[in-house]
Amino acid sequence: MKTGSEFHVGIVGLGSMGMGAALSYVRAGLSTWGADLNSNACATLKEAGACGVSDNAATFAEKLDALLVLVVNAAQVKQVLFGETGVAQHLKPGTAVMVSSTIASADAQEIATALAGFDLEMLDAPVSGGAVKAANGEMTVMASGSDIAFERLAPVLEAVAGKVYRIGAEPGLGSTVKIIHQLLAGVHIAAGAEAMALAARAGIPLDVMYDVVTNAAGNSWMFENRMRHVVDGDYTPHSAVDIFVKDLGLVADTAKALHFPLPLASTALNMFTSASNAGYGKEDDSAVIKIFSGITLPGAKS
C-alpha cells in the first residue's frame, strides 16, 4: 500500500465539503489533485499545495490511486464518471472511487456496476459533518463496499474522517443511511426555523431565544449551527435550500418505495420547496425561515 506523497488522490467537487476534504488530503501529505468548474476554487486548492487542478479530472486521472467524487447529485456523479469527457475511462484498472454525494440507493448500485465494467472499485460513502469538520478532517463517513475498496481507500478515509461506519458490502447501503440521516437534518432545520419564526412573531429577541435553546434540552446540532445564521442575518450558503429540496425528495422517494409514511419529513420538504419557490433556493438552508410572513428577521451585520 502506497503512503504519503506516493499515494495520489483526486477529488471532483470543490464546494465547502469537497474543499475541506481536499485540504485534509494536502495536510495529510497525500499527493492531491482537484477538479471543479469554479476556477477560484481550483486556484485556492493549488495555492494550498495541490499537485495540480483542472476543470476536468480526466487530465490527471492516470496518475491517481483513488478518486473522491463529491458533487451535488447522482446526475452529476454519472456525468463526471461516464459522460463524454468522463474520468472513469481514464483511470487505471483497480483504482478505487469513493462516491460521497447524497444519492439514491439505486443510483449508487447502478454507478458501482458501471465502474466495475472499467475494473474500478467503488465505495458508496456519503459524508456528513459540515464544512468545519470537513476542513479539520473529521467528517463522519457512512460507507458500504467491498473489503478491497475499504483497503485501497484507507489513506483517503484516514485523512478526511473522524469516524467511519462500515454499513456493509453492498453499494447502496451507505446511501440509504445518509438519506435517513438527512430526514433528521432537514426536519431539525425546519423545526428550528419554525421556532425562531414564532419567537420573532411573539416579540422575543432572536439572539435571546437562540441563547436559551442552545443551553437547554430543546437544542440540536442543526439548530445551534443553522439558527446562528438567522440571528446574524447571514444567509451565505454553506448548504443551500435547494440541497434539502433534493435530499428530502430522496427521503420521500425512499419511503414511497417502502410504502412508509413520513409526516414530519413531508412537511419539512414542503417548507423547503416553498422557500425555493419564493426565490431562496440558492441561499443557506436556514433561509427556510423566510417562508413565514408577518415577522421581521435580523439583517446582516456590518
Curated annotation (Swiss-Prot):
Pfam families: NAD_binding_11, NAD_binding_2. Keywords: Carbohydrate metabolism, NAD, NADP, Oxidoreductase. GO terms for biological process: organic acid catabolic process. The keyword Oxidoreductase applies. It catalyses: L-threonate + NAD(+) = 2-dehydro-L-erythronate + NADH + H(+). InterPro entries: 3-OH-isobutyrate_DH-rel_CS, 6-PGluconate_DH-like_C_sf, 6PGD_dom2, 6PGDH_NADP-bd, HIBADH-like_NADP-bd, HIBADH-related, LtnD, NAD(P)-bd_dom_sf. NAD(+) binds at residues 7-35, 102, 246. The keyword Glycoprotein does not apply. It comes from the Bacteria. It is an enzyme of class 1 (oxidoreductase). Gene3D superfamilies: N-(1-d-carboxylethyl)-l-norvaline Dehydrogenase, domain 2, NAD(P)-binding Rossmann-like Domain. The active site is at 178. One of its GO terms (molecular function) is NAD binding. Its EC number is 1.1.1.411. Signal peptide: none annotated. Catalyzes oxidation of L-threonate to 2-oxo-tetronate. Can use either NAD(+) or NADP(+) as cosubstrate, with a preference for NAD(+). Belongs to the HIBADH-related family. L-threonate dehydrogenase subfamily. This is L-threonate dehydrogenase. It comes from Escherichia coli (strain K12). The gene is ltnD.
